[in-house]
């Protein structure tokens, strides 16, 4: 691998360890030329299904869009960035596990809601209010009552 500091190909791995529950390998590398150290992450490249939107159009899965929606729901909530990444990785893992080439956007929304329910109940309600298109306070109340059970 090329050194990001001096662009030479003389780099060696000095440490490797599993991260993200074993789905990634973190490697510390050292350049043989300039002796700078840097970190790389390696993971299997698997196909994530395309998303079928509610209007029938299809688009590639967008991890940034998922992350943005989850982070928006978690805004000002006490949830670590590491927990958010684990939730996103779990959603992606579940999408890959379907074995389908295309999945409905509703599935992504349901998976996100399930992860948010585990992370933070307030964020779950925030996300659900948009995802489920709450029209009035009664719908909030019904969803909150479901959480209490």
Swiss-Prot record:
Cofactor: Zn(2+)
GO molecular function, one term: zinc ion binding
Source domain of life: Bacteria
One Pfam family hit: Zn_ribbon_NrdR
InterPro entries documented for this protein: ATP-cone_dom, NrdR-like_N, RNR_NrdR-like
Family annotation (NCBIfam families): transcriptional regulator NrdR (TIGR00244)
Similarity comment text for this entry: Belongs to the NrdR family.
Protein name as annotated: Transcriptional repressor NrdR
Species name: Haemophilus influenzae (strain PittEE)
